[in-house]
Amino acid sequence: MTLDLTDLQQRLRAFAAARQWQPYHTPKNLAMALMVEAAELQELFQWLTPEESQQLTADPAQKERVGEEMADVLLYLLQLADHTGVDLRDAVERKLVKNAIKHPAPPADPASADGP
């Protein structure tokens, strides 16, 4: 799946404008809404064992709920990036480079060349 982030941001802008929500879509409010949606996603997994959490989306209804909450998180993140002028593509690329430096992969073990 390929997501066109710019297209999604434009659609979200139009959606909010059609409902006259722009005054409420401040960085503070969007960040707070993002956290509420992330908490709703977390709630689906909250009291599950690690094994149960890995199997949650085997149930189509639960998979739908998880997907909806993930979509809410992504949509608020896109709106927050749009309102703060953060280019998410650039931010992600820079962060991946930083993470690779901060957490380098261990040297390959010749004895395990076949993989796990």
What are these regions (language model features)?
Residues 1-116:
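Flexible "arm" and connector segments at domain edges
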